[in-house]
Design a protein with these regions (language model features):
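Conserved ABC ATPase "signature" region
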Residues: 5-22
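Conserved ABC ATPase signature
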Residues: 27-31, 35
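Hydrophobic anchor residue at the start of the ABC signature
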Residues: 41
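A short, proline-enriched helix->beta-strand linker immediately N-terminal to the Walker B motif
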Residues: 46-50
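Catalytic Walker B motif of ABC-type/P-loop ATPase nucleotide-binding domains
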Residues: 52-55
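Helical segment within the ABC ATPase nucleotide-binding domain
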Residues: 67-79
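Conserved beta-strand-loop-alpha-helix hinge in the C-terminal portion
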Residues: 107-132
Length: 141
């Protein structure tokens, strides 16, 4: 059993990282769609999972909230050595990954690995692949 003090500390830490501290005592009908999405992410990461499945995790978020969420997911990956399988159509979101599989017509079209590239350089490579395969017609995983 986890001590209550430890649970409370973890909740406050994650809520702070996802900018949802001010809604912890609110009912679902009192919060926005983006806040609900960030709460769902908090639920997914609260127990330090070894595998995190993220399907369009930034879909309902504004750019600031998206960046905060992606930074949190990235720190989970680094600190907990968690594997994160993320599906996204957004090149910026994909640039936070270390490895990307591009799907086209239900098959793997290409793989990119970040390696030692900066996120900005990796983002440019992602855009180049998307241009090569027709932009929005593919999925980035």
């Amino acid at each position: 059993k986890v001590p209550a003090r430890s649970v409370e500390s973890r909740i406050l830490d994650i809520a702070g990282k996802l900018n949802i501290s001010d809604i912890l005592n609110k009912y679902p009908y009192q919060v926005s769609g983006g806040q609900k999405q960030r709460c769902a992410c908090a639920r997914a990461i609260i127990n330090n999972p070894k595998l995190l499945l993220a399907d369009e995790p930034t879909g309902a978020l504004d750019s600031h909230s998206s960046q905060m969420l992606l930074s949190t997911i990235q720190s989970i990956n680094e600190q907990l050595r968690a594997t994160i399988l993320m599906v996204t159509h957004d090149a910026f979101t994909a640039s936070y990954a270390s490895r990307i599989l591009f799907l086209k017509d239900g098959e793997i079209f290409m793989e990119l690995r970040k390696g030692n590239d900066s996120r900005s350089d990796f983002f440019d490579k992602i855009l180049n692949v998307l241009t090569m395969i027709g932009g929005g017609q593919s999925h980035v995983c």
